[in-house]
Curated annotation (Swiss-Prot):
Keywords: Aminoacyl-tRNA synthetase, ATP-binding, Cytoplasm, Ligase, Metal-binding, Nucleotide-binding, Protein biosynthesis, RNA-binding, tRNA-binding, Zinc
Chief location bin: cytoplasm
PANTHER family assigned to the protein according to its UniProt record, in alphabetical order: ALANINE--TRNA LIGASE, CYTOPLASMIC, ALANYL-TRNA SYNTHETASE
EC number, as in UniProt: 6.1.1.7
Location of this chain's protein in the cell: Cytoplasm
Name used for this protein in its record: Alanine--tRNA ligase
Source organism, top-level taxon: Bacteria
Cofactor, how bound (note): Binds 1 zinc ion per subunit.
Protein role: Catalyzes the attachment of alanine to tRNA(Ala) in a two-step reaction: alanine is first activated by ATP to form Ala-AMP and then transferred to the acceptor end of tRNA(Ala). Also edits incorrectly charged Ser-tRNA(Ala) and Gly-tRNA(Ala) via its editing domain.
Binding residue positions for Zn(2+): 571, 575, 674, 678
Length: 885
């Protein structure tokens, strides 16, 4: 099953059973105690704890999560990932223990064809809290599990609580047995490599008191309502269902791993350390992509620091495989393509994401180049002296001068068998923070430190001139490189430029920063981003394209006119769509978020159900009516109280000062507080084309539109497609829907006939294969290379047919095929062969090793694959040799 199939099966199953399907919340958690959403339950905590009444009795979701606590384990175990998706089903005082167990067992063991996940009951084990006899009996009654496959464990592993007084309760975990090839018998209590946890059911029923540790606390009594909170790791189930060895090889992650292998010239599976590095790349690129799609930006503090660390570990992993050049331009598109089906926003917002990623990579490549040399020297000197610890001042120098995060220094030291004098490092950091002066040897750490901007902010606020002009003459007030104030920057440098005035708009209010340049005598700076790092100060992140720029140089800020035109069209279009929404849906449909860039706008609004196509069309028509009416756009600055008296709309979550800017479009038709850039009349927007509407939470919807040139281009593409269809199908445009429906029905009929013909063709091949069996010890081996096949399923069907027709004598069937350049070997055994010691999983792994890949399965049926089609013959020989041994 593909990851998307597992996700859909989950949501469909629970949705059909009365659960409200809740879209994933952002990775940026609303919980102030969390940097990220770390578990599927996080968005539901207010309901589970009773702080907020649940708006539904039961719910289900597939939640995006980020955890970096075990970041060093990424790539080294089959199931540690920093980004993962958690399937969850929740009950808020509705059903409880028995029903939760029944749901879990039914979904797991129902066949894929009938909407389940298709696990064999024989492969599943469960654990329960050792005092929870109710859960044990429920498992025996519902699943028919014997006592030996229901293991009772203590509070440390099978009792959930928050770590403080509050809700608590026993839990029951479900495990998949990967077979004896992965570890010893004995169940989950003995081996977590062989027995992989796939689902945890938490029975939240008690109130716990104070205590320390995982198990030292008192149960005070029952909760007023009993809740259910369950979590299934989507990636874990995916790697088990896809027959691969770990989560890095599933369909949503493997494309990045393969691209890393191609770029490095290394072969996955050939070297353990290279394999770990490729997995790190695959995991961290995906995590970085998803974080940036939810608005996180690389920085030196908080969430941004975690993102920066992931990206820098990726760069370093590629360098350790011999790739010194930039690779994000290849890796991030591969991850985008793998994830966009489940999360379209990663594709929609990829221009912004990629600009951030590529700039971050270029900066760190330069950091690595200087810092690695110093660290290598320090490692060599330490070892030459017989030492075991790198000096703290060396680690401090790397951090302070070269921007090396301390965790990276610690990691690189450990790889060389050394430690770092962390105590001395921390002491130097403390001394640095207490010094007022900031000379070259004692610059403050970039971690969570904004003091580098203090001297510039003291000179006054940056004046934004971009409302009135696209080019502004100014002077270079300050330059920042690597978190330090410098006097100059040269070609190739990534720097921040501070100016007393600028025509370039800094990202805010949902509007993306302007594109453009800063030019002067002898230098040309490309603007990568414009931000407000501290209140009142605008910082321009630039790359020096040519020349050398210095503090005090005269300069001109130049806004990309096409970009600004598109951005103003999008922002004014957002105001029109917002006003149209409220006209159609009522005043409760207020804006809860927005994003605007040239040609595109996205508006989130409070609403709890999908919009019908008729409603969408009505909103679009009203907004475009305002465009056609050529409404005048007027901006005014006034006290906030006066603005409110005029009815200007203040948006939820935005913070306003005493003086605000009011944007009127057609007078009261649309009146909002807004600091963004806008057209001067609504007709300049050109056209608003609503292209999407979706859910972004239980009480919010999102409407997406193209505006201006992009809207016309999109309609032109649609018109061309319709024209091509009418020509190809020789059908008038108004009859196209019926004609296409007829063609789809004919296609389904043809596909059924083809499937019947293929089944007959497979049946006809069976006698010839049966006739060519040869004896290997006590077993008859039937093996053949089938050449080109449509898919691995075709090979599997033929293997199964041959085994069924082979009779009761011991028989092993091993057939191989080339499925579009991917070699596949399927091995099957009958009962007599298994009694004689033949195991399909072992034989498939022997073949896969020759093919340069992996394999596995059960004793009766297993699959191996790889990348080397030319080795299929040798792989079949390996099966024969493994069987003979």
């Amino acid at each position: 099953m593909q990851t998307a199939d597992i996700r859909n099966a989950w949501l469909t199953y629970f949705g059909d059973r009365g659960h409200t399907v809740v879209p994933s919340a952002s990775l940026v958690s609303d919980d102030p105690t969390l940097l990220f959403t770390v578990a599927g339950m996080v968005p539901f905590v207010p309901y589970l704890t009773g702080v907020v009444p649940a708006p539904f009795p039961r719910a289900t979701s597939v939640q995006k999560c980020i955890r970096t606590l075990d970041i060093e384990e990424v790539g080294r175990t089959p199931r540690h990932g920093t980004f993962f998706q958690m399937n969850g089903n929740f009950s808020f005082g509705d059903y409880f223990k028995e029903q939760a167990i029944a749901y879990a067992w039914e979904l797991l063991t129902t066949s894929e064809a009938d909407g389940g996940l298709g696990f064999s009951p024989d492969d599943l084990w469960v654990t329960v809290y050792h005092e929870d006899d109710e859960a044990r009996q429920a498992w025996k009654r519902i699943a028919g599990l014997p006592d030996e496959r229901i293991q009772g464990l203590g509070r440390d592993t099978n009792y959930w609580h928050t770590g403080q007084p509050g809700p608590a309760g026993p839990c029951s975990e479900i495990f998949f047995d990967r077979g004896p090839a992965y570890g010893a018998d004995g169940g989950p209590a003995t081996d977590d490599d062989r027995y992989v946890e796939i689902w945890n059911l938490v029975f939240m029923q008690y109130l716990r008191g104070a205590g320390t540790g995982k198990s030292d606390f008192e149960i005070l009594g029952d909760l007023p309502k009993k809740n259910i909170d369950t979590g299934m790791g989507l990636e874990r189930v995916a790697f088990l269902k896809q027959g691969v060895e770990n989560m890095y090889e599933i369909d949503q992650v493997r494309p990045v791993l393969d691209r890393a292998a191609e770029l490095s010239g290394r072969r996955y599976g050939a070297d353990h350390e290279d394999d770990v590095r490729m997995r790190i790349v695959a995991d961290h690129v995906r995590s970085s992509l998803m974080l940036m799609s939810d608005g996180v930006r690389p920085s030196n503090e908080g969430r941004g620091y975690i993102l920066r660390r992931l990206m820098r570990r990726t760069v370093r992993a590629m360098r350790l495989m011999g790739v010194d050049a930039a690779t994000f331009g290849e890796l991030f598109p591969a991850s985008r393509d793998a994830m966009k089906a489940a999360y379209p926003e990663v594709s929609d917002d990829f221009d912004r994401i990629s600009r951030l990623a590529y700039a971050e990579e270029e900066t760190f490549l330069r950091t690595l180049s200087g810092g690695t040399t110093i660290l290598d020297v320090a490692v060599g000197e330490t070892k030459a002296k017989g030492g075991e610890r790198i000096a703290g001042d060396t680690a401090f120098l790397l951090h302070d001068t070269f921007g090396f995060p301390i965790d990276l220094t610690l990691e690189m030291a450990e790889e060389n068998g050394l430690t770092v004098d962390r105590e001395a490092f921390d002491r130097l950091m403390l001394e640095q923070r207490t010094r007022a002066k900031a000379d070259a040897k004692s610059k403050k750490t970039a971690l969570a430190d904004l003091t580098v901007y203090s001297e510039f902010r003291a000179a006054g606020e940056t004046r934004f001139t971009g409302y009135d002009e696209l080019e502004t003459g100014t002077t270079i007030l300050g330059l920042i490189v690597g978190g330090r104030s410098v006097d100059h920057a040269v070609a190739g440098d990534i720097a921040e430029v501070i100016l007393p005035e600028t025509s370039l708009y800094a990202e805010s209010g949902g509007q993306e920063a302007d594109a453009g340049s800063i030019v002067g005598q002898g230098f040309d700076l490309e603007v990568l981003d414009v931000q407000k790092p501290v209140k009142g100060l605008i910082s321009h992140r630039v790359q020096v394209r040519s020349g050398e720029v210095g503090v005090g140089d005269a300069a001109t800020t130049v806004v990309d006119a096409d970009w600004r035109r598109g951005a103003t069209q999008a922002h004014s279009g957002t105001h029109l769509v917002h006003a149209a929404l409220r006209q159609v849906l009522g005043q409760d449909a207020h804006q809860s978020g927005s994003y605007n860039r040239a040609g595109y706008m996205r508006l989130d609004f409070a609403w709890n159900q999908a919009l019908s196509s008729e409603t969408r069309s009505e909103i679009e028509d009203i907004a475009n009516g305002a465009v056609r009416d050529d409404l005048r756009v007027v901006t005014r600055v006034m006290p906030i109280d006066e603005a409110k008296q005029l009815g200007a709309m203040a948006l939820f979550g935005e913070k306003y000062g005493d003086t605000v800017r009011v944007v009127d479009i057609g007078g009261p038709w649309s009146r909002e507080l807004c600091a963004g850039t806008h057209v001067s009349s609504s007709a300049q927007i050109g056209l608003i084309n609503v292209v999407g509407e979706s859910s972004v939470g239980s009480t919010n919807r999102r409407i997406e539109s193209l505006v201006g040139r992009e809207a016309f281009q999109d309609l032109a593409v649609e018109r061309a497609i319709v024209s091509q269809l009418t020509s190809t199908l020789k059908t008038p445009r108004e009859q196209l829907p019926d004609r296409i429906a007829d063609l789809m029905q004919n296609l389904k009929t043809a596909e059924r006939r083809i499937a019947d013909f293929e089944a007959q063709a497979l049946q006809q091949r069976v006698p010839a294969l049966l006739a060519q069996g040869s004896r290997v010890g006590a077993v008859t081996l039937i093996q053949e290379s089938l050449g080109a096949v449509r898919s691995a399923d075709e090979v599997r069907q033929l293997v199964t047919l041959v085994r069924e027709r082979a009779g009761s004598e011991p028989v092993v069937v091993a057939l191989a095929g080339d499925a579009g350049g991917k070699p596949t070997v399927i091995v099957a055994t009958n009962q007599a062969a298994r009694d004689a010691g033949a195991k399909a999983g072992q034989l498939a792994r022997a073949a896969a090793a020759v093919l340069g890949g992996g394999g596995g399965g059960k004793d009766d049926l297993a699959q191996g694959g790889g990348s080397d089609v030319s080795a299929i013959g040798d792989a079949l020989t390996a099966v024969r040799q493994a069987l003979a041994s």
